[in-house]
Structure formats: C-alpha cells, structure tokens
C-alpha cells in the first residue's frame, strides 16, 4: 500500500469490477486499484460446481445477510447470500448463462431515454467477452441449420474471456419433465439466449472443463495480475467515499476511505471511482458517504451531501416457489448421495472425468412460459432439479424426488436497502417486500397451477409423481398465494437499488452511462443500476453492463490522446 493515488479506483472485485479492472488496466498509463472486502478466490469449493452448497452461508465467501421479516412471506426472514470473495456472486451462484429477453432491454431504452440499451445494441457487448462452446473448432460442423436460421450473424461470440459450456450430465427424470412441458404446450428450445426465451431445455453454464468459471479467473487471473499498473487489495472494506464541493454547486468524488483490518487508509482517484459492490453494498456505501435519502441519512447522523431518494429504493428480486414431487423408479441425487458408496462413486466420477453430480449447476433444466394464456410473453422461469431439500444448507431428503422451482420474471413488488447506522461494519436492512402486490400474488398462485399441469402430463406418469410441497390439499388461488409465502425463497437476483433513469425521474440515481446524479467522477456499475430486473438470471447481464461502461469510460475525451499506449487487443472475435 505504498501508493495511494490512482487513476481509477474500482470498489468490489465481483462480476462487474473484475471486467472493469481488466479493460481499464490494458492502458499502461492507467493506474488501477481494485478494493475487495473479501478474500482471494482460493477456497476449493468455489471452483467445484456443486460447491455452491458449501459457499452459501459460509463466512469465507458470503456476506451472511438476512432480510427483514417479510409480510409477504408470512413474517419469515430469508438468508440473502452475496459473494464476499474475488469473483463476487459469480463465485457462489448457479453458473447459468442467461442474457434475458429482448423486451427487457427495449424497456431499459425507454426508461433511460437512451437507445444504446436496446437489444440490438447490447448484443455486441455480450459477444465482446463471450467464448461459446458452439464455436469451438470441434463443434462448428454440428451447429444446426435451425440455429443458424434463428441467429444469423448476431448471436454468439468466441475468443472472449467468459466461457459458456453445455452441462456435463443429464437425468432421465429431467428429460421426462421436459417432455411433459412440451405436452403441456411449452415448445422445446436449445437456446435461451436468442431474445425470446419461451421454451424448455437445458441451461448453458459458465464452466470450463467441469470447473466453475468465475469472473476472477476470466478477467483478473492471470491477465491483470501481471500488469505493473494494476494493484489489488483484498480484505479491505470501504467505509465511505470522499467528496469535494465544486464551485457553483455539485461535488466530485476524489477517492475513498478504506479499512484494511488494521488501519484506515485514504486512497485518491485522479479520474474516476467505480462503485461495483453490488445491489446491496453499493447503496449502503453511497448512504454512508452522504448520498441518498436525506431523511434517512439525517436520522443516522450523516451529513447529506447529495439528496438522492432513489438510493436503496427500487429493490427487485426473483422469488422462487419450490414445488417438490416424490417419484418412484427414478435416479435422483437424493438416492445417489444417500450412502457412503454412492458419495464415493460421485467423487470418483468427478476426479476422473470432471463429470457427474459434482460438476452440475444447482439447476440443469429450465423452462420459460406464461402464467396464464392472457400474458403477452413468457413471465415465468422454471429451474428444475433432480433433488430436493427443505432449504439450502439442509440435508437432501431421504426419498427420490425432483424440485420444480418457478419464479415470476417481472415482479411488481419493490423493496429497499437501507443502512442501519453510520457504522460501515453493520449490515444494512434488506426489505424485499416480496408478494406485496395483488398482481404478484396472483402470478404466484397461477404459477403453481402451471406446475401441476406440467407434472400431470403422460411423460411423467411412469414415475408416479406425488406432490410433497406445497400439497394437493391446497387448491384455491388464495391458499396457493398464502402457501407461496410459506415455501418461497430468493433465487439470489437482487437488482435496481441505484437505478439508471431519465433526468425527469426523481428516483433515478444514475444517468444512462452509470454516472451518479450531481457528482462528477463517480459511477455505479453493478446489478443495482438495472432500472428493471431482467427476465432470467442476472449475472451475465451485469457483465454486459460492465463491458458497456468500460467502453464509455475509455471514450472520455481525455483518453483519446493516450490510446497509443494501450496494449494490443489479442483476443479474436468470431460470431455466428
């Protein structure tokens, strides 16, 4: 920590922060500091795909947040996992590669007044860092004509850092569920990333050769580690941002105060501070710095530097309702892992082949469909698993079963993230307010009816599925909505707490280029910037946002005269 002045300070070494460090430090004249509150991603369970079970709820890798008791969940409080390690949530998540639907980004363009957020404008940013299995040399000849017809030359990329692969195992019970979904009217698909996700099929995942592929591997190691202009601090937590008043009004962010575990260090940014701490921690850091709802800050004795009521508001998340079905005559993870011999066989298969249950994502099969025929588009997502348990961290059930988890892709419920004191070490109050609207409660009930319709199809009949949760005795919409509050849990997709928006939107924290309103030299680049939640898993959209942010930052007029010192681009781009 000999030098405390840098060009760019990146706060948070997770999904967005890792990519930004990679892109900004390519120019040898850019001194880049990465500040990460967690540890290096050297915990072995991070890299074994099934290891998410041992990372969630583990202080080595998780912030261990809890939500406030939630009326929509009948007073329950949920564990709210957030990655506290290099790679952030990409080190502990479900590894599913999902862009979202085209209409998500068309809506962003409308809400921000910026057409660069339209679907056809974000696709290049997705492809920029993509390394897709379909474009591997040994796979090109097998790409179907149907895939080519659907996608033309605007679909996937190769040669980037972000590896996308097929899953390395299949299950008969999941194949039967897919067939049942088709019998229920949901079409088959081999691609959930074409812009219209409706269909049933197997998810693609961010893995490489049977290992989790997190953003620390993809963007930091070894590339950034070998650059003399890049510095990284781990176990270092930002207590607040430093703001300087400007003549004529407004402020400029000049740096941050950082607790290293033994001392408070002040770091300075000559160009920009990039806050990438996630949809929970970024609003907390802003609030601790005097940026946020004035009344909230004053209540905790914090000087109001910029009254932005939207900081910590607009929290959105996907709430998964987990229906569990007992089955007969099916191989499931419950039965495979029920004995020492079974566990040994699972471990041996992974050790020898990097395949089998230890290589699997939490959810293998997915489906996008509509909660009722009147919906104009797919508003439900299924994550189907060949296992069952009462809650993450609990043991698997001792009977053969599968779980059909369904979530409302576009909830209208909105929550908050608010600091609880001026002490940066105290966790913020997280109040998602799930199922707080009549619309969301109706979709919850409808989604359980859809699940039952799928499971009742002939394809699953040989396995004699028996509903274990929520229970066939509950039939009315009112009962099912109430039961959803008893059994539903987060699917770990919080977004929106520092949203982008038009200048006319009083709740917008950022402009469409991630710049904090009224404060120069400060951007927030993470899932909190999303105006609305995407229709699917949120990790890869966050990475796309960081790619666009990097491009905008480097196009600053000050940079134009310095581009000659940038490292040559060695990655190639191949699109299909």
Predicted segments, located by residue:
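Internal hydrophobic alpha-helix adjacent to the cofactor/substrate pocket in enzyme cavities
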Residues: 181, 449-456, 547-559
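A conserved FAD-binding loop/helix module that cradles the flavin
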Residues: 533-551
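Extreme N-terminal leader/targeting segments of oxidoreductases
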Residues: 1-8, 26-29, 551-576
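A glycine-rich dinucleotide-binding beta-alpha-beta segment and adjacent secondary-structure elements
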Residues: 207, 211, 234, 239-247, ...
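FAD cofactor-binding and catalytic pocket of flavoenzymes
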Residues: 324-444, 490-496, 504, 524-527, ...
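N-terminal glycine-rich phosphate/pyrophosphate-binding loop and immediately adjacent elements
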Residues: 1-129, 136, 307-308, 318-320, ...
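Conserved redox-cofactor binding core of oxidoreductases
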Residues: 110-253, 322-344
